[in-house]
A protein has these predicted regions:
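Ribosome-associated RNA-binding proteins
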Residues: 39, 110-111
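Amphipathic alpha-helical interface surfaces
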Residues: 6, 22, 26, 34, ...
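N-terminal positively charged helical leader segments and presequences
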Residues: 31-53, 60-62
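Short secondary-structure boundary segments
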Residues: 42, 67-68, 88
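Signal for well-folded cores of large energy- and translation-related assemblies
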Residues: 11, 31, 57, 78, ...
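N-terminal first-folded block
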Residues: 2-40
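C-terminal structural segments of small proteins and small subunits
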Residues: 71-110
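Mid-chain, well-packed structural core segment of small domains
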Residues: 54-81
Length: 111
């Protein structure tokens, strides 16, 4: 349920022009000093994830792993991608909160 809300919020952020979709645009956003958060799909390749995490660490930006695959993200946003940069502080904070709530729910379900 919370993941559907996250995908909906991503859709709103995309329509508002606050997302950089794809590896290269996300890396460019980090290099340009845009304070953001990076969301990655759970099926992103290890090599791509390593590169994104390295760049994010240098820019002091959080990387959050979503529970969705690239195909699921693509269905929600209209573009299949595994790396999303959220370039708006308000959207980024809300997505951080939603991702942490989802992680807490999953931990409770496992126990």
């Amino acid at each position: 349920m919370s993941q559907n809300k996250l995908l909906s919020l991503l859709g709103i952020a995309r329509r508002a022009g606050r997302l950089s979709l794809g590896n290269d645009p996300a890396l460019e956003a980090m290099r340009n000093g845009q304070k953001c958060v990076i969301l990655v799909a759970n099926d992103l390749s290890k090599r791509t994830l390593k590169g994104v995490c390295f760049a994010a660490e240098e820019a002091h930006i959080d990387v959050l792993t979503m529970n969705e695959t690239m195909d699921e993200i693509g269905a929600a946003l209209g573009k299949r991608t595994g790396v999303i940069a959220v370039n708006d502080a308000g959207f980024a904070n809300k997505m951080r909160t939603m991702c942490s709530e989802t992680d807490n729910q999953q931990k409770n379900e496992e126990e």
